[in-house]
Structure formats: structure tokens, C-alpha cells
Amino acid sequence: MSATDLSPTSLREAFGHFPSGVIAIAAEVDGTRVGLAASTFVPVSLEPPLVAFCVQNSSTTWPKLKDLPSLGISVLGEAHDTAARTLAAKTGDRFAGLETESRDSGAVFINGTSVWLESAIEQLVPAGDHTIVVLRVSDIVINEAVPPIVFHRSAFRKLGA
């Protein structure tokens, strides 16, 4: 191993060595599905049920979601590599080709994912060029038959057996 500078490029490469799951955060805004993808998801607490993810402060999608009463979190499965890229795109229909389910609360979920978490924002924590979004979970749906997708070194991968 060798020392490397702390440039954003070097940090992104270093952080990319840590494998992570991928989630979609989505809701309906004035009848339109709005969502984004994140690979910085973490369970936080069982009592109360809290989870968190990080969002870039430069996101143009987050301002549309951050004041809503309910958000849908879908934990993407290994069949969702294309969906993850589409949801992370800066332009275009992020839900193209995806089957979704909307709840009366406005939360939107992607069908065929491993877990749905309906949630509401509990706390926003400024953290450098990102914001840590802490969410209180109000409902869960688990689909144990769906294996997860993993984001590692800028690529989507499947877990080995």
C-alpha cells in the first residue's frame, strides 16, 4: 500500500473499495414519481426504528423530496443494476421500465426489490458536501427471495454464494 493525496478523486476511489447496498428513495410529487438512488444507506436504531442515507448537497432531486411527509425506500436487488443507473441519472425518466407501487401517503416503491421501508424524515445533519438524512420507519415489507445488488469500485455486483 502507498500513501495517496486526499483529492476528491482519490477519496472517491478509496471509498469505492467499501461494498454497499443500493436503495431508491421515492415519492409522488404533484402526481409525478420523483426519486433518486443512494449507496450510503445504513440501519441506525431498532428502538425507535431509524435508518439513514446521505445525499449530495448539489442534488436537484432532493429538494423535491425533503419536505414530504412520507418517503419510500426500496432496497434494490441484483436484477436492478440498470434501474440503479437510471435512478442515479441526472436527466430523463428515472422510472423508465420500472414497475412501482404508490401508497396513499405518497411513498413510492419499486416492485421486485428485497425490502420496502416507508419512512418520514426524523433529522437532517449537515456533513460536508452531503447531508445525512435520518428517517423513522413506519412500515416494512420484506421479500426474502430477492438477493441484493452491491455497489463496489464503481460497478454493480452480485454477492457470491
Swiss-Prot record:
Reaction(s) catalysed by this chain's protein: FMNH2 + NAD(+) = FMN + NADH + 2 H(+); FADH2 + NAD(+) = FAD + NADH + 2 H(+)
Involved pathway(s): Sulfur metabolism; dibenzothiophene degradation
Gene: dszD
Pfam families reported for this sequence: Flavin_Reduct
InterPro entries membership: Flavin_Rdtase-like_dom (IPR002563), NADH-dep_flavin_reductase (IPR050268), Split_barrel_FMN-bd (IPR012349)
Binding site for FMN: 30, 37-40, 54-61, 88, 94, 151
Domain of life: Bacteria
Keywords tagged on the record: Cytoplasm, FAD, Flavoprotein, FMN, Nucleotide-binding, Oxidoreductase
Purpose: An NADH:FMN oxidoreductase which supplies reduced FMN for the '4S' desulfurization pathway that removes covalently bound sulfur from dibenzothiophene (DBT) without breaking carbon-carbon bonds. Can also use FAD. Provides DszC and probably also DszA (DBT-monooxygenase and DBTO2-monooxygenase respectively) with reduced flavin (FMN and/or FAD).
Name of this chain's protein: NADH:FMN oxidoreductase
SMART domains reported for this sequence: Flavin_Reduct (SM00903)
An annotated GO BP: dibenzothiophene catabolic process
Enzyme class: oxidoreductase
Gene Ontology CC: one annotated term: cytoplasm
Subcellular location: Cytoplasm
Transport listed as a keyword: no
Any one GO MF annotation of this record: riboflavin reductase (NADPH) activity
Keyword Oxidoreductase listed: yes
EC number: 1.5.1.37, 1.5.1.42
SUPFAM superfamilies, per the entry: FMN-binding split barrel
Family classification: Belongs to the non-flavoprotein flavin reductase family.
